[in-house]
């Protein structure tokens, strides 16, 4: 028996605070069959959900982003089984807004991972059994603003030793351990040498898959020691006033298939889509656009295993960016 898990990229409501469950159904209508066909759906919620007057913008570099409690209807309409909160915006309005967000998710029976009222909670794994397969999902982000520490609430900031210990701990109780990582260089279609080595290290420490995002563009994927690493999914729903790059509204869902009878067989299938800001709709690609995008994903994936070429691309990107 196989288990199909969908990993979706960044979901943010900064310029769409009005989105509720009914609006979400319209936004997601073209994606309905894809979402419904999965056994498990995992989405990155990249903003707190709190009403006006709860929380205040923290001091940070970059925008402070917040959604409203009604926006949880998007996750419900999408059938979200796990909300990933480990990212650089979940703490944008401080601890009170994060606490409110956790309450909203609890009220709507949406499990979450990657943030909490303290560091231990933020690093807690989400465990689930589906189709006779037990999974542990861990989620961490790069150490920017809004991360947890000690008894301070926030997202799970990356700590290799702590994460390695958690992977080992979860391997004792689950068949598969998946790490969702929020990090990378924005708008770069190739992962940095640091990200590549970091995610490969997690596989060597026991992660059965690493699924990453944050770059606001698609990056490729590879199999390392027979384990899939997806370097960036791109945005899923992230409408913006003035997107700075054409890549902003393009992405892919990573469908991870686990064969329960062949534990070494974990397969990734990219499902590309596009968000149309005028129609306010996410649609799977088809025809020539689908073929072109799949070839593009294949091309940017082929260079990843090479030890030298991605480094040369990265250095060039650093110069021109």
Language model feature labels by segment:
Residues 1-321:
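Acidic, metal/ion-coordinating pockets
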């Amino acid at each position: 028996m196989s288990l199909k898990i969908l990993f979706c990229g960044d979901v943010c409501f900064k310029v769409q605070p009005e989105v509720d469950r009914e609006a979400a159904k319209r936004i997601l209508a073209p994606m309905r069959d894809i979402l419904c066909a999965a056994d498990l759906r995992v989405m990155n919620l990249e903003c707190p959900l709190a009403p006006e007057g709860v929380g205040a913008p923290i001091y940070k570099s970059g925008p402070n982003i917040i959604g409203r409690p009604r926006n949880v209807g998007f996750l419900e309409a999408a059938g979200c089984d796990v909300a990933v909160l480990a990212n650089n915006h979940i703490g944008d309005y401080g601890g009170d807004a994060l606490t409110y967000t956790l309450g909203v998710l609890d009220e709507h029976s949406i499990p979450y991972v990657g943030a909490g009222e303290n560091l231990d909670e933020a690093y807690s794994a989400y465990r689930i059994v589906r189709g006779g397969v037990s999974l542990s999902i861990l989620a961490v982000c790069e150490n920017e603003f809004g991360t947890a520490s000690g008894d301070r609430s926030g997202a799970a900031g990356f700590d290799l030793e702590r994460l390695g210990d958690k992977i080992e701990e979860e391997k004792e109780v689950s068949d598969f351990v998946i790490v969702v990582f929020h990090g990378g260089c924005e708008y770069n279609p190739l992962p940095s040498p640091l990200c590549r080595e970091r995610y490969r290290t997690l596989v060597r420490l026991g992660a059965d898959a690493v699924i990453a995002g944050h770059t606001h563009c698609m990056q490729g994927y590879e199999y390392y020691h027979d384990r899939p690493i997806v370097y960036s999914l791109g945005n899923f729903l992230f409408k913006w006033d003035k997107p700075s790059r054409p890549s902003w509204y393009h992405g892919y869902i990573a469908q991870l298939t686990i064969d329960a009878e062949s534990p070494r067989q974990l397969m990734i299938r990219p499902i590309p889509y596009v968000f149309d800001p005028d129609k306010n709709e996410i649609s799977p690609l088809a025809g020539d656009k689908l073929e072109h995008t799949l070839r593009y994903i294949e091309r940017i994936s082929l260079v990843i295993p090479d030890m030298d070429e991605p480094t040369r691309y990265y250095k060039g990107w650093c110069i021109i960016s």
